[in-house]
Amino acid sequence: MLHVNKCQLCETRRPSICESCLKKQLYDFYHKRDEFSRDIESELEKVAKLKSESFSLKGKITQKEELTYRLQNLAASLNEKKSLSCDLHSRKQLIEDDLSNRKKSINIASQKLAGLSHSTSDYFSKEYLTAYRRSELLQNKLHEYQKKLITRVLDMYQLHWQRDLVLNTQGCTQKSAQMGSEFNPDSIDSSLAYRLSKLSMGNSKSDLSHSDNETGHFYSNFFSQVMELNASVTISGIPVCIRSKEKMFLNPDCALTLSFICIFLAQYTSIPLPCPLQLPSPDQKPMTSFSSEQMLYIMYNIVWISWNCGIFSFPRGITQSQLFELMQYTGFWLVQLRTKPLTSQKPDWHYKMGMDFDLFHRLYLARLPIPINYSSLRSRSSSKPYQLIS
């Protein structure tokens, strides 16, 4: 309760109070209240300042603690770095010492090997040359054995052709007349392939030393002789090719025999056949007919074996139609396999010989749009080819 000086009347008449004294008391009360409120606000401001200062101090304390922790980590990392640098220096020194020791040992070993290198290189070079010559001899022997096997297979199936064939070429007629009865007909037959393969040695027309007319005349003359030779070839007494309507076809009576010949030659020369062959199993009766595709398979397989054996190389100037015509003369290819030697080059199976079977088949269909009935082309009874097999 505020203590204010009262008038005498109010002092005597307690607890009553007059209006003037009441005003004084109220004035004093509001005045005191304002002072208290100002004091409270100032104190609140001080408290707020103290709070902000305490927050800043707390942040500084936290930052100080973090810095202290980082300093401790930095000191620990510095100590670790010093220890690692010491270890690295020691390891570096050990490696340098090891390298110096190894260099010394290498120098000593190189000095020792210097005296032996010359003799060792001579020894290995001699061994390499010896092995290379031995491999060449073995390769030549292998080709000789393969050639003997090819000859025996073709002789076993009684391959024959016109032995007294005289070529219409310069030099061959004179040679046959000079040698008389001692003349070897195999050399004449093999020269057919030689004369055409000789054209493949040149890279351009200028290398052939022939004009276009002379080259065309040579091709026509050569193909006429190939046709004459092909028409005279027989297997087991049966013509390999027969003519029908001025076109040459593979004799179906020889299909089974030629299939066995292809299999034997591919086995003895280690040449994979590009086309499958159809053979009867032992418990089946002999096949009475072959399909047109089987006949094409046989023709293509024989040309494939001849080409991969190095018997014949197609010239660069030959056209596609001429190549297709030449590949159909199966008798000619059999004669080349019988008369010409094998080459020593290893064939590349991934290299195409100029015409794959798909192109060969398409050209055949274009030449004969109507499939031919091979049963109508038989030269004699179908039981004839199976006599030798049985």
UniProtKB/Swiss-Prot annotation:
Keyword Cell membrane: no
Membrane topology: Peripheral membrane protein
GO molecular function per UniProt: phosphatidylinositol 3-kinase regulator activity; protein-membrane adaptor activity
UniProt keyword annotations, A-Z: Autophagy, Coiled coil, Cytoplasm, Membrane, Protein transport, Transport, Vacuole
Gene Ontology CC: autophagosome; cytoplasm; cytosol; extrinsic component of omegasome membrane; extrinsic component of phagophore assembly site membrane; fungal-type vacuole membrane; phagophore assembly site; phosphatidylinositol 3-kinase complex, class III
Subcellular location: Cytoplasm; Preautophagosomal structure membrane; Vacuole membrane
GO biological process terms on file: autophagosome assembly; autophagosome membrane docking; cellular response to starvation; macroautophagy; mitophagy; protein transport
Annotated region described as Cysteine repeats, given as residue ranges: 7-21
Role noted for this protein: Functions as a part of the autophagy-specific VPS34 PI3-kinase complex I that plays a role in autophagosome assembly. This complex is essential to recruit the atg8-phosphatidylinositol conjugate and the atg12-atg5 conjugate to the pre-autophagosomal structure.
Domain notes: Coiled-Coils at the N-terminal half are essential for autophagy.
Family: Belongs to the ATG14 family.
Name listed for the protein in its UniProt record: Autophagy-related protein 14
Organism: Schizosaccharomyces pombe (strain 972 / ATCC 24843) (Fission yeast)
Gene: atg14
